[in-house]
């Protein structure tokens, strides 16, 4: 029978030459170098993690700061910003700008009086629902519109005479201005619901 191979004692030094059939003795220095390289890699990884944390902590307050809008949209009450608003409106009207602040959007100031002036909107149709061309009106309604045109022309002539008389106090106008204003205020307005041209029953009966 073969004898039982007992394991070597841990406390006793191992004889590598006798146990190793190839006669290779492990190098203790290579094992120490492996440990040293491993420690260096761990230290480098820790340093990189700390640098990344510091960089992220510095970038967070910069990202929280809101982006300031352009000068021509901030403080419309000041004189400089109002001049910038006028220049911006004459050239090109900027779109609605959404900001991160409490105000959801900023609308630039637009002078609507110039648009109304250019369109030359008639005063008699300001309060109506929609504008009806005279070609769709009946003969009686066209005659009424002609009378209204004459009254407005008379009123404008009286207004020009009054302005000239106020500029020249020597020449006084003979016609009273109150009569034209009373006629202008008492004129009837066009009602599409009572007009004969908007009667659908006539087309149905035919």
Curated annotation (Swiss-Prot):
GO terms for cellular component: cytoplasm. The keyword Cytoplasm applies. The keyword Phosphoprotein applies. Residues 40-73, 165-186 have a biased composition (Low complexity). Residues 38-88, 160-206 are annotated as: Disordered. The modification Phosphoserine is found at residue 68. Residues 78-88, 192-206 have a biased composition (Polar residues). It is found in: Cytoplasm. Keywords: Cytoplasm, Phosphoprotein. Present with 922 molecules/cell in log phase SD medium. This is Uncharacterized protein YPL229W. It comes from Saccharomyces cerevisiae (strain ATCC 204508 / S288c) (Baker's yeast). The lineage of its organism: Eukaryota, Fungi, Dikarya, Ascomycota, Saccharomycotina.
